Structure formats: structure tokens, C-alpha cells
Amino acid sequence: MSSPYGKVDEREHVRLEARRKTRKNIAIIAVSLVILAGIVIGAVFGTMAHKKSPETVETNNNGDSISVSVKAVCDVTLHKEKCFETLGSAPNASSLNPEELFRYAVKITIAEVSKAINAFSSSLGDEKNNITMNACAELLDLTIDNLNNTLTSSSNGDVTVPELVDDLRTWLSSAGTYQRTCVETLAPDMRPFGESHLKNSTELTSNALAIITWLGKIADSFKLRRRLLTTADVEVDFHAGRRLLQSTDLRKVADIVVAKDGSGKYRTIKRALQDVPEKSEKRTIIYVKKGVYFENVKVEKKMWNVIVVGDGESKSIVSGRLNVIDGTPTFKTATFAVFGKGFMARDMGFINTAGPSKHQAVALMVSADLTAFYRCTMNAYQDTLYVHAQRQFYRECTIIGTVDFIFGNSASVLQSCRILPRRPMKGQQNTITAQGRTDPNMNTGISIHRCNISPLGDLTDVMTFLGRPWKNFSTTVIMDSYLHGFIDRKGWLPWTGDSAPDTIFYGEYKNTGPGASTKNRVKWKGLRFLSTKEANRFTVKPFIDGGRWLPATKVPFRSGL
């Protein structure tokens, strides 16, 4: 069946094709400039610091000389010793430029992850450990996919330099997230095993991320972002997208119809997904008729560009009840889990009915790049919405929960959403967010923009906080949102103790409502009351590169503040 987007996409394609060809050539030249700049900077700083010939400024543990490029690259990493050890021993290291060193670093990381996979595969034991080990195997497989993405895309000239850097940082951030999730998924007695086998690959992933972040800053210093990424580069009428979405009924042009009463092609969503072609660039539209579908659904990583559209967020509902207390790892509890890139859901509800006593029980988990959710509901208690990894956008959605009910380590923007804390278990307090950034060079965080945060029911006797820092570099901002008076005046809660790491980034900007006063907020170094310039970093266009991919989804969005 023909796609409702065909005519619009074709028109945009024709309009942009000539510009893309020009941009491709410019981007290739720009990448070369970045590489050249890296060599020059490495040579200058290396020579100044050591007063030696620019060819050799350092030696490794074996007494071998290290080139200025290796020195420059490794100096920006968090694990310098590991960097010198791996890159310094690269074949012809002295003749490699920073881009070649970056690619070599990624290849070594892939080799280390492969070793870890073999170690996990050979350590399967009792049934409980097998569940977590299999989860780790899946996560490490995703890690390798993302590392391979960096190798296949780093020479692709069909994007601007800033877009290229953002892609690479996203995939490397996700690779780090998947490895961390693997360790956290293991039973406590197995975590030392996981940490020891993933130590090398985790450090190498961090180093590769640091290198590409550094090269991105060099690109900025050459003003490449300003030249190559301007509003003229993407001539898209966002309001036209809104009109098309409102005027086009995707249900009438669906490729597959799911209905509990048998009036569709299939009775379950899981069965419908089996018809999705692998890695297809064409949209596959699945219409889910009204009803409650009791199934745990997984959109596999090879299921690209799937649209799931329902009859309404309170009418077409996917319901599950997997939870941690009954023996399922958090990563596997999701009622609806998304791993296929380019996924979109509209007018759907996702519920986990396990209840508060079952603790972690995810309604929706998203671990796929370039995903959008429009007019959807995610309803559970603890850990409702798992924004696990990659770039994600939520528009006019409703998220209901109690403890850490928006959590994960993706780059996510929630815009014009309703966020509704509900009554938790007796003795619990509500925390809306728990962001999981573990590395300063990751480009991840949770951005809550123009949302309404209000209680679901009477919560006057329940302490409710905007969030707590799950990891040392936790990054969360709340901007231009309405905050009901039930929000505790301190605003934020420590994960442990009475403070938070200085390295977190929590921000508030121009919020309104009785809960928005910052007068009595916690006095943390990492809590900032943002300027307009700072807040703009966390809007759709710069934070999730939304101007590049959201227009094609036809989901309405605000690109800036």
C-alpha cells in the first residue's frame, strides 16, 4: 500500500537534492580541515610542552616513541594510560592522523567487546543467571552495532560536520550505555565478573567518545557549524507538517491492521511485526484498533521505520505486568520495547499493571535512534518510561508514575507533555526523573520543555521531587513548564546522602506555577538556573538534531525555546 508521505517526501527530496550534493563536497573538505587542525594542535602543544621534535614527544612503557598525533589525541581522554597503550602500539602509529587513530580506537574497542561476549557466553549457569547473561549478550550485540555505525559513517560526506559529530557521539554514548546496563542487569554476585570483563571495552569506548568530542570542538572553532548547519539547509515548513498530520488518517493507509475482534489481518501486534521487512527505508504503518492487547511487544533492531497508530491513547492499549520482584531484570520488564530506528507511535497507550509493590516495572522502553511518540500514554508506577539510549522525542504525551518514572541515558526531549506523579507505596516519595549519564563527553540528558507537571489525585501528603541524579554526570533540564504546588520546594533529591556530585547538570528555566519558585531549591553546585543561551542547548534542534529528522515524521514540534 502506498505511503501517505510519498508525495511530500518526494517534493522535499527534489528540493534538497542539489543542496545535498554541494553539502557532501563541503562536508568532506570540512572533515579534512578538522583532521588537519588536530594534527597541527597536537604538534604545537606537544612541542611546546616537551621541547622535543614534533615527531616524537612521549614514550610508552616499552620505551617506544609516540607520535604527536597520539599524544594530542590521548591527552583529551579520561583513560590516558589505556589510550597510550592501545594507540601507541597501533601499526604505523607515528604516521596516523587523528581520524585514523579514532577509527583504530573503535576497532580495538569492538575486539574487546567481542572478547567480553565470548566470556559471557561461556559462563551460562543456573536459570536466573542465564536470563541476565542473555540480556547482557543482547546489550553487547547492540554495543557492537553502534561501534560499527561509527566506522561506516565516519567517512560519509552526506552530512554536515556538526551532524556527523553528533551522530558519532550518539552512537558512542549508546555503546557506553549498553555496557553499563549489562553490568547493572547482572545479579549482585555476578557484577564483579561483568565489570572485570567489560573494563577494557568501557574505557576504550570512553576514550573514543572523548576523541570525537574533541574533534567536534575543533570544528566549532573553525565556525563549521555556522557555515554548514543553518536554517537554509533544511527548508521545511514545520506547520505544513502539522497540517498534514492532522489531515491524513494513517489508519486508512495502514499496511497491516491489528484487531482483537478478528476484523484485521492479525489479532496481536507481535504477529504484525513479523511482516515488517528488515532494515527497510520505507515506512511500515501498523494500525492497532481499539482494545486492550495483553502482550509484551518488542520492535527488533532490524525493524526500521515502523509506525504504530491506534484509535486513541485510552482506546488502543498494550498491557503487561513483568517486573523485577517476580524475577525479570528491569531491562526486560517493558510492556513495549523499541530497538528499531526511525520508530514512531501515535495515539497509543502503554501500561504496566504490576503495581507499586513490584518495584521496577517498565511500560515503555526506547533504545532506538530517531524515535518519536505523539499523543501516547505511558502508565505505570516505578520506572514507567525507560528512555534508555539514542535520540528520542515525545510530544503531547502523558507519563504517569511514582519513583524515577522517566529514566535512562538517551538524549530525549519531552515537549508539551503531561507528567503526572501518582500515589506511591506507603513510605515512598516520588521522583520524576533519574538520568543516567556516566561520562562527561556523552551527549545525553532529559529535556522537559513546555510541559505540565501536576498530581494525579491528591498528593498533599507525598513528597514529590523533580528528580534525583542516578549517575555522576546526570543531566536534566526543565524549561518553560508549569509546576504544580505539590512539588517539594527543594526541587531535587539526592540519590544517596544529603547532596549530589558536583559534576551533575540540573537546570531550570522560566518555569511557572506555585512549584516553580527557586528560592528554596537545594544548594548544589550542579544545579543551575539557566540563561536563555544555556537553555537553548537543550531544545529540539541542537539537543537531538531534530531539525534534520523530525520534519519527516510529521509530528509537530518546536525547534527552539
From Swiss-Prot:
It catalyses: [(1->4)-alpha-D-galacturonosyl methyl ester](n) + n H2O = [(1->4)-alpha-D-galacturonosyl](n) + n methanol + n H(+). One of its GO terms (biological process) is cell wall modification. Residues 64-211 are annotated as: Pectinesterase inhibitor 24. The record marks 382 as: Transition state stabilizer. Substrate binds at residues 330, 360, 468, 470. Glycans are attached at residues 92, 130, 148, 200, 472. Its main location: membrane. It is a single-pass membrane protein. It is found in: Membrane. The chain crosses the membrane at residues 26-46. Pathway: Glycan metabolism; pectin degradation; 2-dehydro-3-deoxy-D-gluconate from pectin: step 1/5. NCBIfam families: PME_inhib. Acts in the modification of cell walls via demethylesterification of cell wall pectin. This is Putative pectinesterase/pectinesterase inhibitor 24.
